[in-house]
Amino acid sequence: MKTPTALLVFEELRDLETYGSILRSSGYGTRMCTSVAEGIEALETEDISIVILDQGTPAFEGRQVLVRSLQLRPEVPVLVIARTLDMHCYLEAMDLGAIDYLEKPDRQDMLWVLDTQMRRGAFA
């Protein structure tokens, strides 16, 4: 079985490095992007198993990556991570097709969600 690759799209480099390190130490490959445009390009050109994106501020800027991901690769699960729970953004993300919406810095929940998706066969 190939190593699943997570596409991380975070505005803040510190968050990107933190979550990337957690994923790599848990056996995942990572592709890290600091902009929506870079994330969408990676979706279009690389073999991505799951997308993990920052909600962004003040509006749900990650929406662009979520929508584009589901258009290009509807089989790839998308997990949204937010600094604080915003019920409007949560409902929008779930309505658009995100598999989950977690508050930072809940790293253990992120790994639990990824492991659950792997067991379900989402990482083909």
Residue ranges and their predicted role:
Residues 44-46, 68-75, 96:
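Conserved phosphotransfer cores of two-component systems
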Residues 49-69, 85, 89:
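Conserved phosphotransfer microenvironments
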Residues 64, 82-101:
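Alpha4 helix (beta4-alpha4-beta5 surface) of REC/receiver domains from two-component response regulators
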Residues 16, 90, 94, 110-124:
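Receiver (REC) domain switch/output surface
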Residues 32-50:
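Acidic, metal-coordinating helix/loop segments flanking the phosphotransfer/catalytic sites
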Residues 51, 78, 101-102:
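Two-component signal transduction core modules
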Residues 11, 81-85, 105:
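Conserved active-site segment of CheY-like receiver
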Residues 12-32:
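Two-component/phosphorelay signaling modules centered on CheY-like receiver
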